[in-house]
C-alpha cells in the first residue's frame, strides 16, 4: 500500500526513483475508497481447485475484494457438479451490464488446439470485447494469456518440442515495473504448457513490456505500460502438489511424461515437492491488485464505458 507524505519532504523524489509508491497530500485527501470488484473467468476443468488457489492469493491483500465467477455457457463442464456452477457462477449474459475493477482469465487444457476450434472461443472473444469498456485491468494466465494475445494482438502460440513442466528460474527484466515491487532479481514459479509465444512476435506486433523472462521458460510476464493488460504464462497460483497431480494424471492416461523439472527432491516422484514460489505468488497478485487496479481504477466504474484508450488492439 502507498504511504502518505508531506509534499515538500526531500525524500519524496528519492523514494519515487526507487519505485516506492508515494501518495502526496493532495491525492490522499481526495481519494475515494470502496471495495474492489473482481471477476474470475474460470476455464479450468477442476473449477473448485482453481477457485481456492486464486482466492487464497487475492485474500493476501489488505483490500476488501468482492469476487464473482464467470463460466462459458457454450461449454458443458464435465468435472464440476451442475449445482456448484448454478450456485456460484454466472453466465456472460448475467454480468454483461456490470463493471469490474479487475478480470482474471485462467488457463485451460486446450492449448494444443487451434484457438478457433475451442468450443467456447466465440463466447470468449465476446468477453474480451466487452472487457474493453467494462473492466479496468485484465490479468491473463497461461492459456488465457495466449488467447488474449492472439485475439487482441494477433500473436499466435508456437508449439514446444516437449512439454514445459516444472519449477523454473525467471529474471526480473523491468525492476521499475510496479508488478515487480518486492521481487528479488530472480524468482521461481511453476510452468506447465506445450506452447509459447516468441519475443520476436511480441516486439513486432505489440508495444507490451517484457517484465520477466527465463532461459528455460522464455517469456514469463508481459504488461501494457499502464498495466491494464497483464499476461503471465506461468502458474503462480499452483499449490504444492498441483504439478504432481498433473504428472500422475498424464501417467494414468499413457502420455509417459517427463518428471517435472526442479520439483521433486532428487527427481523422485515419491517425495513431497518443495514449495518455493509462495512468496513470489503473493507478491505478484498483491502488486496487480494494488498498482494495476486499486490505485488507478475510477471510483465510478461506469466511467470505463467512455474510455477505450488503453487497448492497443483497437
UniProtKB/Swiss-Prot annotation:
Mind telling me which residues the site (Important for acyl-CoA specificity) is annotated on? 111
Q: Which residues are marked as site: Important for substrate specificity?
A: 192
GO annotation (BP), single: L-methionine biosynthetic process from homoserine via O-succinyl-L-homoserine and cystathionine
* Gene3D superfamilies, sorted: 3.40.50.880
**What is the E.C. number?**
2.3.1.31
User: Which residues catalyse the reaction?
Assistant: 142, 235, 237
Q: Where in the cell is it found?
A: Cytoplasm
Q: Keywords on this record?
A: Acyltransferase, Amino-acid biosynthesis, Cytoplasm, Methionine biosynthesis, Transferase
Q: Enzyme class, one word?
A: transferase
Pathway membership, UniProt: Amino-acid biosynthesis; L-methionine biosynthesis via de novo pathway; O-acetyl-L-homoserine from L-homoserine: step 1/1
- Gene for this protein? metAA
Designated name of the protein: Homoserine O-acetyltransferase
Reactions it catalyzes? L-homoserine + acetyl-CoA = O-acetyl-L-homoserine + CoA
Residues reported to bind substrate: 163, 192, 249
Classification via NCBIfam families: metA (TIGR01001)
Extract one GO molecular function annotation from the record.
Answer: homoserine O-acetyltransferase activity
State where it is primarily located: cytoplasm
Q: Which residues form the signal peptide?
A: none
List the record's Gene Ontology CC terms alphabetically: cytoplasm
Recorded hits in InterPro entries, A to Z, give: Class_I_gatase-like (IPR029062), HST_MetA (IPR005697), MetA_family (IPR033752)
- In UniProt terms, what function does this protein have? Transfers an acetyl group from acetyl-CoA to L-homoserine, forming acetyl-L-homoserine.
Record Pfam families:
HTS (PF04204)
The source organism is Streptococcus thermophilus (strain ATCC BAA-250 / LMG 18311)
Report the family membership.
Answer: Belongs to the MetA family.
